Amino acid sequence: MKLHELQPAEGSRKVRNRVGRGIGSGNGKTAGKGHKGQKARSGGGVRPGFEGGQNPLYRRLPKRGFTNIHRKEYTVVNLDVLNRFEAGTEVTPELLIETKTVKNVKHGIKVLGNGNLDKNLTVKAHKFSASAVKAIEAAGGKTEVV
């Protein structure tokens, strides 16, 4: 085999279909667009969601709710993440950021009760779920709202 004999693998290269290039191509004359009408014109077509003049679905459905601009976004920390700290440690939001356990803290940290905690820790955070408080205290630790 020589360099000039190299061929691409069968089926790896697809020839671009050149439309509107003669009747013999099978895609000449109207170039696969049919006859006349809005969709046959250059730049023609209807916008997404257009239903032929019928009131579209997005206008038939009522508006619901609103976005609260004062919403607080808490960074979530689960119990199984707290297991990486030594027993007796005071886990604060600053410590969590320092150890790169959490990042992008916007309005504070909320501790949730997902996973198991088997060390007694003093956990300080902005919010706690009821199950997290129960699990931390069951492990002999304390919770404190900052």
UniProtKB/Swiss-Prot annotation:
Belongs to the universal ribosomal protein uL15 family. Binds to the 23S rRNA. Keywords: Ribonucleoprotein, Ribosomal protein, RNA-binding, rRNA-binding. PROSITE patterns: RIBOSOMAL_L15. Residues 1-13 have a biased composition (Basic and acidic residues). Residues 21-31, 42-52 have a biased composition (Gly residues). Part of the 50S ribosomal subunit. Residues 1-58 are annotated as: Disordered. NCBIfam families: rplO_bact (TIGR01071). It comes from Shouchella clausii (strain KSM-K16) (Alkalihalobacillus clausii). This is Large ribosomal subunit protein uL15. One of its GO terms (biological process) is translation. PANTHER family: 50S RIBOSOMAL PROTEIN L15, LARGE RIBOSOMAL SUBUNIT PROTEIN UL15M. InterPro entries: Ribosomal_uL15, Ribosomal_uL15/eL18, Ribosomal_uL15/eL18_sf, Ribosomal_uL15_bac-type, Ribosomal_uL15_CS. GO terms for molecular function: rRNA binding; structural constituent of ribosome. Pfam families: Ribosomal_L27A. GO terms for cellular component: cytosolic large ribosomal subunit.
